[in-house]
Amino acid sequence: MFVSLRSGTIRARKLYARLSVRWIFFLTLATVITTLSASWGFKALPVQAAEEKPFRIDALLQTPDWLTLSGEHRIRMSQLANQFRPTLDENDEALSLRTLLKAEATFGKIRFVGEMQDSRAFFTDENSAVSTAVVDSFELLQGYVNVRFDDIIGKGSTLDITGGRQTLDIGSRRLIGRNGHRNTIQAFTGLHAHWQGADRSELRLFTVLPVSTLPSDRESLLKNKSAFNEEDFDLRLWGVFYKRPNLFLGGAGEFYVYGLQEDDDPKERQTRNRALYTPGFRLIKNPKAGAWDFDIENTLQFGTRRATTAVTDSENLDVFAHFHHLEIGYTWQVPWSPRLDFEFDFASGETSTSDDDANRFDTLFGPRRSEFGPTGIFGILGRENIISPGLRLSAKPNARTDGFISWRANWLDEETDSFARSGVGDATGQSGSFGGHQIEGRVRYWLRKNSVRLEAGAALFIEGAFLKNAPAAAGNGDPLFFYSNVTFSF
């Protein structure tokens, strides 16, 4: 017992030393940047003071009216203790930098838009969880032409036609969305038509090629190497989305169907040859002080895919999967505007590997931070093989500050499939069905409104029977993750 205690103490000291060095570095860097920002006119005002004008680079450069320049730079330090992924280091860390630079040239109803992304990670090592979700250095994120037409199909309506490389935010963003928390952002190349009626109804039609992040090998990612991202016709995405306001109990209704077609590229990559069709609907009423709100989404998925990416695997499996989200909340009309909501997510898992069916839900290109916690080197939860009820309490003390705490209990839908995004599975189904509890919190503060924002968050995953007993479990104990970042908008 004493040997075990001493070993645990030594491990704790080593972890503390690693954390201390990194956090001292990060806090020092944040202090320097904050001091410099104050000297450049970013000085924070008291909450009660009048709203200050945000700093904007195009105002500084006095660009002509037709040209708009903007950007963002984010510095984030992340630490993960007790890694849940098998074969990776027990403790992980990353200093992530993300810079976005955007230029818009507007000539009447025509806009030309270009946006660059530079995402890098430091303090990572060979067994880090670094991936293309963290690193994508010096890349054209967006480059498109947008044309607007007024009074199309109704007076007061608008129609935007966008062609080129672009990011997409569709509906709830659970299936297709522009990443916010993640260090890299998914882009698409193609055509997108967006019609909006005078009554706030919407219709979207799009056909695009998802952009693949390059390079993707571990050595290149660890060295932050650059390569031009690519898209090709071996991976295609299309969709139809319609939104109608005031459809149900004062809330809006959304209806959609998305299609994804994927083929092998003999020279580049082998795939599961997915041919997926994902129809669904959503009912939503946004939070409002002194009122109830809700968010209900139901999605089916069918088509074909293969069990593996192996060249020898030529058998198509019949896909039938599904995902469901339920959220009911209430916001009190009192100081701090506290909101308490009940959340429930269900995403199907693989029922068997010995039949001709595939049942694990594919979340396509949907961000997961809003429901399932921080991603990056963390991100144990996702919309795959999960049954997850939870509670969330959020508050906004003032115009500069907001935060929340949340709890989720997480079960496997299928005991023989891997749990959510953990990478841990038990084909025998003998390790149980309870994945564990996740407790998470976050606070954000505008040091200067719409210019400098501070953010800190933490998540603790208390392992259940499955992650303790599964043969492939990492066995490092309860994962603990925390991060802090500073974001400059200009």
Question: What is the predicted role of each segment?
Answer:
Residues 148-161, 178-354, 396-399, 407-411, ...:
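Signature for the C-terminal beta-barrel architecture of outer-membrane proteins
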Residues 447-489:
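Predominantly the C-terminal beta-signal and adjacent terminal strand-loop region
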Residues 2-5, 26-29, 33-92, 98-108, ...:
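N-terminal periplasmic/intermembrane-space "pro-region" immediately following the signal or transit peptide
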Residues 233-239, 369-392, 396:
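Outer-membrane beta-barrel signature, preferentially recognizing the C-terminal barrel domain
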Residues 83-97, 107-161, 174-177, 223-227, ...:
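Surface-exposed loop and membrane-interface regions of Gram-negative outer-membrane beta-barrel proteins
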Residues 76-80, 112-115, 119-123, 166-170, ...:
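Structural signature of outer-membrane beta-barrel domains
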Residues 359-383, 414-429:
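Flexible internal linker/loop segments at domain or repeat junctions
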Residues 1-21:
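N-terminal secretory signal peptides that target proteins for export/translocation
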